[in-house]
Amino acid sequence: MDDTGPRQLTWRWRVLAAIIILAVRVLRWRIEVQGLEHVPARGGAVLAFNHHSYVDFMMVGWPIVRQRRRPMRFLAKREIWSSRKVGWVVRWAGAIPVDRGSDSAREAAFEAATQALQAGDLVAVAPEQTISPSFELLPLRTGAARMAQQAGVPIVPVAGWGSQRALTKGGTKRLIRKLPVTVRFGDAVHVGPDDDVVEVTEELTRRMTRLLHEVQDTYPDGAPPGARWVPARLGGGAPDHAEVLREHTERERGWTRSDPRSADSEDPGRPDGAAGPA
């Protein structure tokens, strides 16, 4: 691992940061950042965040760029590169494209992310791989643990809450003003060269779940009964998590049967914890 110093912000990252800061100020979003001290000031680290909105990576990157003065790379679906609206964002940010329909392409993305970590970059991944309709954690894949192990860097668990009220899959897609958003970074998970990545992922799941419950329980706007953006566990109107898990498992199995090349798709070891629209 190269820990000689943090990568510098390029002019493109500075422009992106300025745009994000302007948007947050115009919308008057109230972003509360907690536990940023857990993010290394130098050297590589995997930032594993929960995926519940289309702007998760921005909420994670906001404090990294603004307060840590470090750029952040992230994994995203290759389809985003062809988007007229946001394609330029992922290109400028140096994001790593993931083609989930090809084993070789997924491995190439995994290697690119590992090399970035070894070079001292921060790499953000969404181990759930897709947005969770229940706003509870879906099963995590082991890609984050594998990357961290191969690169010799820690995993920093991250939980965000609030942005799903504005921009999420199958829900509201409008920019709400004065929206409170909480982003909490937790204690790093360290991965030894001989550690079992499945066990590491189980520990990561426990930590991310704990962080998520903490930010949900302390959210400034509470948990209004029946609200679409509130988990059923808290009395909200989001889909039941058990049903979401069942449908998620069936969808994964169906995808595996339809694409024999992806026989490992039921194995959470696939290195494709892509962020971005799912």
Show which residues each predicted segment covers.
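Short, flexible loop segments at the rims of nucleotide/cofactor-binding pockets, characterized by
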Residues: L22-R28, R100-D103, P133-S134
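Generic preference for hydrophobic
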Residues: V33, L47, F74-L75, V183-F185
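Short acidic-hydrophobic, aromatic-tinged amphipathic segments that line or gate anion-handling sites
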Residues: V33, I96-D99, V191
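Catalytic core of membrane glycerolipid acyltransferases/transacylases, capturing the structured
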Residues: P40-S102
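Non-catalytic C-terminal accessory region of glycerolipid acyltransferases
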Residues: D2-Q8, E107-A278
